[in-house]
Amino acid sequence: MKDLPLSIGGKTLTSRFFLGTGRYPNPFVQNEVIRVSEAEVLTFAIRRVNLQAPGEDAILQHLEGKTFTYLPNTSGAKNAEEAIRIARLARASGLSDWIKVEISVNERTLLPDPVETLRATETLANEGFTVLPYTSDDPVLCKRLEEAGAAAVMPGGAPIGTGLGILNPYNLGLIVEEANVPIIVDAGLGSAQDVVQAMELGADGVLMNTPVAKAKDPVKMALAMKHAIEAGRLSYLAGRIPKKRYATASSGLETFISK
C-alpha cells in the first residue's frame, strides 16, 4: 500500500506526531522534546495562554522563531457554549483558526461529553474553524462529528492521562474503516507499544502529552514515540499476516532431505 501525505484543513503535514506542551519539567526540556519529536502540530489549553499578548505568553514565547501549526484546545469547557466562546477568543487574538474541541463534565474521568462536543463542532465548523474534536471511541459518534464538519476526528484510546493504552481496538479499527477524514488517536496512551498498536490499526496520527512529559526521560520518550509512529505506520502499510488458529510451517514438509 502506498502512503499518502497527511492533510488536515488544507495543510499538508510531514509528521504524524501531534504534541502537547503542558506538564514538562521546564521549558528547556519542552523545547528539546519538540526538536527530537519533529512534531509540526503543537496543542495547549487556551486557558493557560495570555490572549491579550500571545507573543509574550510564558508558553508561546519559548517557541518564537520556529514554525508550527498551533492547535489550541478548549480544555476546561463544560458545555458547547463555553467551548465556542473560548475558540472565538483564540481566533480573535490571532492565535489560530485550528481548534481542538475538548468538553468534559466529569473531573474524575475527563471523558468527553458527546452531545456538547457534537454541538460545538457543528457551530465552529460553520464559522470556518478547522475543528478537531476530542471524542470517545464510538464509531457512530465519530461519523457524526465528521458529518458535522470536523477536519479530523480524535478518539481517545483511554481516559486522559491514564496510560491504559488502546482499550477498544475493535472500535478504533471500525472508526478508521468508516472515516473520510483523518483519525488522530488522542489520550490514554502510555508507551511506544500503545502507539504502534494505534498506527497499525490505521490511525493517521497520534496526539500525546502526558506519556512524554511525565516520562522519567521525556526527550528519550519523545524519540521513542516518534519511531513508534513511523514503525506502526509502515507496518500498517506493509500489511500484517492474517491471524489463524493453527500453525503453518515456514518450510513445507516436502523440502525435508531424504536419505
Curated annotation (Swiss-Prot):
1-deoxy-D-xylulose 5-phosphate binds at residues 161, 187-188, 209-210. Gene3D superfamilies: Aldolase class I. It holds the Pfam family ThiG. One of its GO terms (biological process) is thiamine diphosphate biosynthetic process. GO terms for cellular component: cytoplasm. GO terms for molecular function: thiazole synthase activity. PANTHER family: THIAZOLE SYNTHASE. This is Thiazole synthase. It comes from Halalkalibacterium halodurans (strain ATCC BAA-125 / DSM 18197 / FERM 7344 / JCM 9153 / C-125).
